[in-house]
Amino acid sequence: MYTRTDINKFLRTYKSTGDMKRTASDFAEFAHTGQKDKAGNTLFSHIQRVVDILKGDQRDDSIITIGYLHDILDNGGFTQGDLSMFFPENVWEAVVHLSHNKTSCREEYFAQIMESRPAILVKIADLSDNRAIIMNDHPTDKEYWKRVKYNREIDTLTSGLAKFSDCFSSEKDASSFCEESD
């Protein structure tokens, strides 16, 4: 992870193109340089796969932007203040909902995510990618139980979308989204 000095230099010299998704991609690529995901690949490749899932679900630009930034507070050394200089409030607030408070338990973390529709959508994509990494025909016990955990968490998050009335335009949209998440 970069030092605060490195991040401040990046922020001072960054020239935004005005494309929110491109800016988020640049931030994520910088923040996660040298970091690895759960499978030993670059963390940015995980970020890109999450974004690809969101693009496949035809999510809007703000959701795609949040997808790029979803690990930046926890693993990238950036702060909420850093994000607020470059991104609209709805984006950085969702990223804050996705960040872990190291003192809270997993249930409190998920309750925090459930307060934000964009955070829920991005977390479902994040967990779907994490689950895909361990999908194989002969999982170890640890992989099996991780899959069970990811499936349970995806189900919980998908159920949480129901409280956002604008989430789906029809019952069919909701059931189709749930099927894609399985």
Language model features with spans:
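Active-site helical microenvironments for divalent-metal-assisted chemistry
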Residues: M1-D182
